[in-house]
């Protein structure tokens, strides 16, 4: 049995084998895994919002936003030996948890989170190898840096690996 490192909402962490890393409660939030399969290190961020410009400066949490969480996660991974050029990404989440009468862009948080994460990963030149995003159901994800498998449990849809 592996030791599981848990990542809370608007949080991030890094692991090495035999540890795995997990986050629960991904609705409109996006869980992003960055991993170096040569060094066998991985990190996960539970991103709540697309853009740090939405945040209040006095209580700023870099792990909460797509544009700042991935930079922070990258620096934590490099601190434990990851090489930026070896990093790959997997992601899940970004569901539309509620339906709204209007097509107001502000209500599409899940889709906006996914778009912001993809944009930031492009800027960092980190390829996305697999994703399970969108839909209308919550997810729990767990990543194993040894096998490079992201296990995804989706409400009412069971479990799969990417």
Curated annotation (Swiss-Prot):
InterPro entries: CheD-like_sf, Chemorcpt_Glu_NH3ase_CheD, Cytotoxic_necrot_fac-like_cat. Pfam families: CheD (PF03975). The keyword Iron-sulfur does not apply. Keywords: Chemotaxis, Hydrolase. It comes from the Bacteria. GO terms for biological process: chemotaxis. Belongs to the CheD family. Forms a complex with CheC. This is Chemoreceptor glutamine deamidase CheD.
